Structure formats: structure tokens, C-alpha cells
Amino acid sequence: MSKIVKVLGREIIDSRGNPTVEAEVHLESGFVGMAAAPSGASTGSREALELRDGDKARFLGKGVLKAVAAVNGPIAEALIGKDAKNQAEIDQIMIDLDGTDNKANFGANAILAVSLANAKAAAAAKSMPLYAHIAELNGTPGVFSMPLPMMNIINGGEHADNNVDIQEFMIQPVGAKTLKEGLRIGAEVFHNLAKVLKSKGYSTAVGDEGGFAPNLKSNAEALEVIAEAVAAAGYELGKDVTLAMDCAASEFFDKEAGIYNMKGEGKTFTSEEFNHYLAELANQFPIVSIEDGLDESDWAGFKHQTELLGDKLQLVGDDLFVTNTKILAEGIEKGVANSILIKFNQIGSLTETLAAIKMAKDAGYTAVISHRSGETEDATIADLAVGTAAGQIKTGSMSRSDRVAKYNQLIRIEEALGEKAPFNGLKEVKGQ
């Protein structure tokens, strides 16, 4: 029934107009799973390798024909005849065949696309939704929850062509009783934010993740205009809607000088000064979560940040941990951050992703399931969030089909599961 008979890779286009890898896994029973790898813009230096061709004559060097060739060649040969239900075995075969610590031979984009396609094929063979199959792979069959969305409604940093240093300003619809109601709140705030920005003469063009990307006077002004939009939508900031930020601070860290250079504001900070800057913002606004608040290598600074803010705020490690259990284990041991961002292309397989989520939860850290800035219509992260009962998801704003595809899948899942998948809102956020 679930024996693999064919593995196929192809080059498709992502939401930024760059190529990415799509894979199909065909089973003897006729079931097929298909999945595509996402791609990041602000990336951690210790992420698994995304293999690009480097041929400047094609897609400005960003082609993925080498990764596709790995799928259609050695990966396909190794997996044909194997049982798709044995996800850990499938993933380990590809990891061993690649033979590197960071999947540099085949590319994490090749291995991940096949890994996810395999999971989809196996779920189909078992006549169950992907989220239910993921729950079984996770060792938590039948345990589900609907995630609280972190909705990125103002884009800056590497995700936008503007002067805003902090990469993401997000809202969380914590006053909602259901995921679907939360999305309605998010949409209403998003539309009111457009009106607020227009009234101030700001652009309402959007960035990579569907949030607005205006040139603002300061990072604090981003929070101020969001606060205005929340009120204009008829909601109470701090009660119905809370705030979150992804600083992506590695992108404005001057390694040689050892300072954080926020060019948009013309300010520089030491690690300790930047931690106090974030603390001041959190005092002024109901910010409940801060991601990558320092450079990925600034572990001493992160330790100070955790001591300063960790009992009050969720401190999420993205570039810091890169969905890697070895690095996460070090962070847990040293008491650095209290949450991990989960991006399965940072590590390159579903099995390793599930291991990172489990390690985080076992240590009392939260796990936030995340998209990348380069996405496709693939909505697997919605099923991952529900099937692991992770509790939180980051998948962009209320525009761009590559973002909304994930929200729409969550709506379908909530409809199917009903009370079996509670929406716990702010209770899911560390420190709240």
C-alpha cells in the first residue's frame, strides 16, 4: 500500500520570483504527496544549506537544478521500494546519503521537499489528514490545538525596501475565541492600518510577507500606527490584540565594532543598551514576544536579555537556534531565550523538525511554527502547527496568497476538528 514507486523533483517559482524545489512521492497504491521547500531572506549562519546553482545566466544564479537532480537521481534511487509510513527511516536515508552536517551535497531544499511530500503521501495512504499523521509521527496521536497567529502587518529589515530597521511588527488576536475569529480581527486591523498610513501620507505598498512597508520616523512609530489601527478597528490594545516583534538583529549588527547600528533612526547600541531599548518599548506597548532581539552570536547578550526580560516576555530564538537540536540544547543549558522559532528548511527534514519541537516543549520552551519570506502555495506549516499542538504560528499578513494559503488551511482544519482542537490564545505565549 505505502511502498514508494516514484520520486520526482522539479524547479518551480516562489513568492519572490526565485526558483525553489518541489517534490512528488508516488506510492504503489496510487497515492501521491507533493510539497515545496520555502526560502529565507534573513538567514542564520548555521542553517542547513539551501543549494543554488550559481549559474548567473539562469535566474541570476539562484536556479535549483542541482537540487532537483539530487531528487531525481540519488534520492529517488535510495527511496524506491521503501515504506513511506516510516518517516524517520526515509529522512535518515537521505541524511546519510548526503553525508554532510548541513545537507550541503543535496541541499536542504531537496531533502525537505521530499521529506514533506513523503509525509503527505503516507497520510493519504492512511486515509487521514496530514495534521493527524503528523500528530502520530510526533508521538501525540489525537492531540491537537489551533495556533495563535502572529500576523506581520508592518515589514522592515530584509523583508522590505524601507528605512525601518526592525524586520517584523506583528499583532496577535488574543481576544478571539477561535482561530477563525482571530483571523477576522487581524484582517480588520490590517485594513484599518491601511487607512491610518494613508491619512499620514505613508505608502501602503507591501513587503515580502504581505505587511505594509512604509518609511517611518522610527521603529516606535510602527507600534504607534498599529495601536491607532487597533483602536480604529474597535479593539482594545493589550486585551483583544497584543504585539510582537522580530528584530532580526543580526541584520543590523556591526560585527567588527560589536554594536547594533539602527541606520533608520541614526542610533547605535551595545548589547546591554539594546536590551534596555527593547525593555522600554515593552513598557510603552503591550509587546508579549520578541524574536532574535540580538545577533545570533551574541550569547552573552542573550543571557542578559533573558535575565532582564525572560520572566515577562517570550524571547524567541530564530537565527539563534536555527531549528537545530544541538544548538537548542546549548541554549537550554545556558538559560538563553525561552522559545524557539521552527522553520523546517533551517534543518531540512520533518523528523528533525519534530525533534526540535519536542526538545523545546520538554524544556519548558515554547515553539512557534514559521513560514519563510520566500513561500509557495504549500500550506504544510498549518498542519504542522495543529498536529504538534505547538500553539503559535507566524505566517505573514492578511495579503498575498502565499501567506493566506496557510490561514485558509487553518480555517479548514478548525472546521474539521471543532472542539478537538482548542484555541488557547495568550495562554500559549511564554511569560503570559
Swiss-Prot record:
**GO biological-process terms attached to the record:** glycolytic process
Provide the primary localization.
cytoplasm
What this chain does, per the entry, is described as: Catalyzes the reversible conversion of 2-phosphoglycerate (2-PG) into phosphoenolpyruvate (PEP). It is essential for the degradation of carbohydrates via glycolysis.
State what protein this is by name.
Enolase
Name its species. Aliivibrio fischeri (strain MJ11)
HAMAP family assigned: Enolase
State the top-level EC class. lyase
Kindly tell me the pathway this chain contributes to: Carbohydrate degradation; glycolysis; pyruvate from D-glyceraldehyde 3-phosphate: step 4/5
**What cellular component terms from Gene Ontology apply here?**
cell surface; extracellular region; phosphopyruvate hydratase complex
Bound how, and how many: what does the cofactor note say? Binds a second Mg(2+) ion via substrate during catalysis.
Q: Where, subcellularly, is it found?
A: Cytoplasm; Secreted; Cell surface
Question: Where is the chain membrane-spanning?
Answer: none
What is stated as this protein's family in its record?
A: Belongs to the enolase family.
Please tell me where Mg(2+) binds in this chain.
246, 291, 318
Q: Name one GO molecular function term.
A: phosphopyruvate hydratase activity
Quaternary assembly = Component of the RNA degradosome, a multiprotein complex involved in RNA processing and mRNA degradation.
Which residues of this UniProt protein bind (2R)-2-phosphoglycerate?
Answer: 167, 343, 372-373, 394
Q: What cofactor(s) does the depicted protein rely on?
A: Mg(2+)
